[in-house]
């Protein structure tokens, strides 16, 4: 690696995992000027693309996922740590699949399944928006399914 001070080559003095365990911290020394510097090495993750219902494609946005879950959990006794973990788990699962393109339907279904485990009311709220319930009968059917599964 080139020295940021003089452009000369450097050697690695020390390597260790960074505090987040997702990077490697390397202490380096320039062979030309002798100055020391630190670099961080991370795996470059290819972008995850969401394919919308109308065929449009957009980059995965964790904040959109989190906003939807937060809205469903509004005024419910669901700790923020649980919501964050839910979003982390869904994102990790999506990124671990071999597909770089994920239909929005898959994301919605995973959110509903996760919310079903966390809080029934949050699940029904999310489902009513996600599945675009048109009347009370659709709402009732979803509630009945939830009650049967418990």
Swiss-Prot record:
Cofactor: Zn(2+)
BP GO annotations: negative regulation of DNA-templated transcription
InterPro entries per the UniProt record, alphabetical: ATP-cone_dom (IPR005144), NrdR-like_N (IPR055173), RNR_NrdR-like (IPR003796)
Keywords: ATP-binding, DNA-binding, Metal-binding, Nucleotide-binding, Repressor, Transcription, Transcription regulation, Zinc, Zinc-finger
Keyword Metal-binding: yes
Stored Pfam families: ATP-cone, Zn_ribbon_NrdR
Residues of the ATP-cone domain: 48-138
Keyword check for Membrane: no
Protein name as it appears in the record: Transcriptional repressor NrdR
Species, as recorded: Symbiobacterium thermophilum (strain DSM 24528 / JCM 14929 / IAM 14863 / T)
Gene this protein is translated from: nrdR
């Amino acid at each position: 690696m080139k020295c940021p001070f003089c452009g000369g080559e450097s050697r690695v003095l020390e390597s260790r995992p960074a505090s987040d365990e997702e990077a490697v911290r390397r202490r380096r020394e320039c062979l030309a000027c002798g100055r020391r510097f630190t670099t961080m090495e991370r795996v470059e993750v290819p972008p995850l693309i969401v394919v919308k219902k109308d065929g449009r494609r957009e980059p995965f946005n964790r904040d959109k996922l989190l906003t939807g879950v937060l809205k469903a959990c509004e005024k419910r006794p669901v700790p923020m740590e649980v919501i964050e973990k839910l979003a982390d788990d869904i994102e990790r699962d999506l990124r671990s699949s071999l597909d770089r393109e994920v239909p929005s339907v898959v994301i919605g279904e995973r959110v509903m399944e996760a919310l079903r485990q966390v809080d029934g009311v949050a699940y029904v709220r999310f489902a009513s928006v996600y599945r675009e319930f048109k009347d009370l009968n659709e709402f009732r059917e979803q509630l009945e399914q939830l009650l049967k599964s418990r």
